[in-house]
Every structure is written in C-alpha cells, then in structure tokens.
Amino acid sequence: LIKKTILTRKFKEFAADKYEIRHHAVIPGPGEKAVYAKILKEFCEICSFYFTSTGDAKKDAALRLVRQIMLMIRACSTPNTLAGYDGEPFPRKTRYIANLIKTEIPTKVAVGCTTIEAMNMYTDYLGLMFPERPLFTIHGEISFERRQKIIAQFEETADGILVCTQQALKSSTNIPSCDDVILESLQWNIPKMEQFYF
C-alpha cells in the first residue's frame, strides 16, 4: 500500500498565512468599454480579423463562443491593441498597476503577464513611469541560462521591477527576495497561476 500511495498537499496547507492575496477591481475607461461592446455585439463581423477560419463552417460555428471568450480575455488585458479602442494610449489597468507600484511597493516587484503583447505594453509603460528603477524582462523565448542571469541581476537590486510572462517563470524558478507579485490578468488554470506567484 505504501509503494502505491502518493500524498499531495496544496501550498496553502503548509504555508498557512505567510502570504496574502489581494484582488483589485479596476473600472474600465470608455475606450475599453467600447472594445468590450464591439466584441459582444459584433463578434461575427470582426472574428476573421483575429482568428483564421478552419475551412469548415460547422467547426467555425462551434468555435465561435470559445473564440469570443478568448478575445474578451485579450481585451481585458490589452484593449488598446484591438479595433474599436479610442482612448488613452495605455488602458486604466496599466496605469492602476503603475500607481500601485509607486504608492505601495517601494521594493522589488514582479509583474506577471499572460501574453507577450501585454508584457511588452507593461515594459513600455513601467519604463516610462519608473526611469529610476531597474527594469527586467523575461519571456519564454529567452534561454533558461539567460533567465537565470536576469534573475540574478534582479536579485541584486533593491527596487527592481521584473516584467515577465507567467509561463516563463514557474515553479522551477525561485526569487526569494521578491515578496510582491502582481498578476495583470488571470489564467483559466489556477494551479498554473499559483506556480508563478508561489
């Protein structure tokens, strides 16, 4: 029985209350709301701009709702890159996260993005807002050795900002000196997300 039994535990079971997860609600601006409305009301007309047809009308119809949800998730992260956006150069969530870093996180912080597009946007914006703070970027196309060097440089700073894709830094990477992690967008898979911030 012992050879065939595997005990699993969740991080929270042995970490207890050593961490705090806070959720922040950000009210979207008019330009962002316009993008959301366009996706909800005119998806059939704009679908071909974002997704390639399978060549089979039945498959395309079956995928329509999933694709609409995928585009809505993308719009919640980077609405300024989609058709119909008419607003500030950077969405409100980007500005909210920058203000959160400015007012509440004077030390190291990691910002985890779900897409490279979002990572590039946050890198650009946080670079503009915090020119005095060291800024580091990691994504999946960077080799593991290079990632380790970037993390070592980040560890040496007192107030560095690390912007990365959530998939690029998972459980195999440990940054013990960074106590603050911001997820700009949630993933479908909660355990994968937990691999990033734990």
Predicted features and spans:
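Inter-lobe coupling linker of SF2 helicases/translocases
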Residues: 1-86, 91-99, 103-107
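SF2 helicase/translocase ATPase core recognition
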Residues: 11-43, 164-198
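Alpha-helical elements of the RecA-like P-loop NTPase motor core of helicases
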Residues: 34, 95, 120, 124, ...
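Conserved phosphate-coordination/catalytic loops
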Residues: 63, 87-95, 113, 141-148, ...
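Conserved catalytic network of the ASCE P-loop NTPase/AAA+ motor domain
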Residues: 102-104, 153-157, 173-175
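Pre-Walker A (Motif I) flank of P-loop NTPase domains
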Residues: 106-108, 159-160
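Conserved RecA-like ASCE P-loop NTPase motor core of nucleic-acid helicases/translocases
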Residues: 108-115
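Conserved helicase ATPase core of P-loop NTP-dependent helicases/translocases
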Residues: 120, 132-166
